[in-house]
C-alpha cells in the first residue's frame, strides 16, 4: 500500500517518512561523484514539530507520506484548542492552540482554511496567502513625515500588531500576508 521513493527522486513539495518523522521537502540538491553513490541534501520541514532541518540522504529508499488536505471553517476557541468544522462531513476538528501560534494571528470567525492530516493525525493548518482583517486600533498619522514611505503601528482584530501606511484608520479592513505578517493593501 505504501509507495517507496528513492532519495535522489525527491523534489520540493514531496512528503516522506524518515526516522519515524513526517517531512516536507523545501529544497534539495543531488551530488554524484565517480564510483560513489549520490548524496542528496534536503532542506526539510518536520510536519509534526514545524522545525526546519537539513537531512543528508545517500541512496535511501523512503516511504512516501500521503498528506490529506481537508477544507474547514474556523468555529471558535475553547481554552487551549481551536475548533474547526469540516466542510464536507460537518464534524468538529480540535487543534491544540500551541500548534498554531503563528496561524492564530490570521484566523477569525468564519475563516476558511485547509487542515493537513496524515491518516487521522492532524498536523497543521494551511492558510490562504493573504487574508482580510479589521484594524482594531491605528495610531494617529504624523504630519510632515513623508521623507520615505511613512508607516505607523496598527493592532488588528486578532491582536497582531503590524506596520501600516499613515492613511489607514481604525475600523478599516486591510489585506495582510500570512507568510510574513506584512500589510499588502486596503480591502475593497
Swiss-Prot record:
GO terms, molecular function: translation elongation factor activity
Keyword line: Cytoplasm, Elongation factor, Protein biosynthesis
Coiled-coil ranges from the UniProt annotation: none
Gene Ontology cellular component annotations, sorted alphabetically: cytoplasm
Record InterPro entries: Elong-fact-P_C, NA-bd_OB-fold, Rib_uL2_dom2, Transl_elong_fac_P/YeiP, Transl_elong_KOW-like, Transl_elong_P/YeiP_cen, Transl_elong_P/YeiP_CS, Transl_elongation_fac_P
PROSITE patterns in UniProt: EFP
Pfam family, one: EFP_N
GO biological process: peptide biosynthetic process
Acetylation as UniProt keyword: no
Record SMART domains: EFP, Elong-fact-P_C
Source superkingdom: Bacteria
Protein's pathway: Protein biosynthesis; polypeptide chain elongation
Function recorded in the entry: Involved in peptide bond synthesis. Stimulates efficient translation and peptide-bond synthesis on native or reconstituted 70S ribosomes in vitro. Probably functions indirectly by altering the affinity of the ribosome for aminoacyl-tRNA, thus increasing their reactivity as acceptors for peptidyl transferase.
Family: Belongs to the elongation factor P family.
Name assigned to this protein: Elongation factor P
Gene, per the UniProt record: efp
